[in-house]
């Protein structure tokens, strides 16, 4: 089973857990999500991780496309664009404005407790990829504090998570009302190789 599938089934993007944190994040940022189309986006935005060989690499970055296509089919192109732009890296690389779904999605990560997030990410194998990619991204970004940079370079997953959550919370506070994203550095995605029989991560 590929890592993207595992993530959606029982990992960091678990389809029965993550959407609830996303809904809670949306409520904190923008009020209660009364629009049923928002709830559809909450459940569909990460559907494209199914069958992906990696999470943040060449394959994983395209995960936004499936949910966007479904949302566009159901509710129109504007909702497809809204869903696709939930990834700030995808949005920046494609010259798009990140959506409010992106901001709420980042806050959802912050709201997910470490005691839940870390075991899920470890169980699927995502954690090692996330830790590596976070180091690559902070190396080219001036918006990490010294403490956050030290935490992101720590081999301890708990410390790493504290650093990433601190940075992500500040990104949310800075961008909750939209505007240009000068924080996100688009490091070229790369295939993330693992020795698991060639299934990818």
Predicted regions and their residues:
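Transmembrane-helix signature of polytopic, membrane-embedded enzymes
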Residues: 37-39
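Conserved, aromatic- and glycine-enriched, well-ordered alpha/beta core segments
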Residues: 48-53, 64-68
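An active-site-proximal "capping" alpha-helix that borders the catalytic cofactor pocket
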Residues: 19-27, 61-74
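Short helix/loop segments within enzyme catalytic domains
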Residues: 74-82
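Conserved catalytic core of two-metal-ion nucleotidyltransferases
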Residues: 82-89
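Divalent metal-dependent phosphate-bond-processing catalytic cores, especially two-metal-ion Mg2+/Mn2+ enzymes
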Residues: 2-35, 44, 48, 54-55, ...
């Amino acid at each position: 089973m590929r890592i993207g599938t595992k993530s959606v089934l029982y990992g960091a993007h678990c389809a029965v857990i993550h959407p609830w944190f996303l809904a809670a994040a949306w409520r904190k940022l923008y009020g209660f999500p009364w629009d049923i189309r928002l709830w559809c986006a909450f459940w569909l935005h990460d559907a494209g991780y199914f069958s992906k060989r990696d999470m943040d690499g060449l394959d994983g970055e395209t995960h936004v496309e499936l949910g966007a296509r479904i949302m566009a089919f159901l509710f129109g192109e504007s909702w497809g664009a809204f869903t696709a732009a939930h990834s700030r890296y995808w949005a920046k690389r494609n010259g798009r404005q990140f959506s409010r779904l992106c901001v709420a999605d980042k806050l959802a990560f912050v709201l997910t407790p470490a005691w839940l997030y870390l075991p899920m990410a470890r169980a699927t194998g995502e954690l090692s990829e996330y830790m590596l990619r976070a180091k690559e991204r902070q190396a080219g970004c001036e918006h990490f504090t010294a403490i956050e940079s030290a935490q992101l370079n720590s081999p301890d997953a708990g410390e790493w998570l504290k650093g990433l959550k601190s940075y992500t919370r500040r990104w949310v506070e800075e961008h909750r009302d939209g505007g240009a994203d000068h924080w996100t550095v688009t490091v070229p995605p790369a295939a993330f190789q693992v020795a698991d029989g060639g299934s990818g991560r």
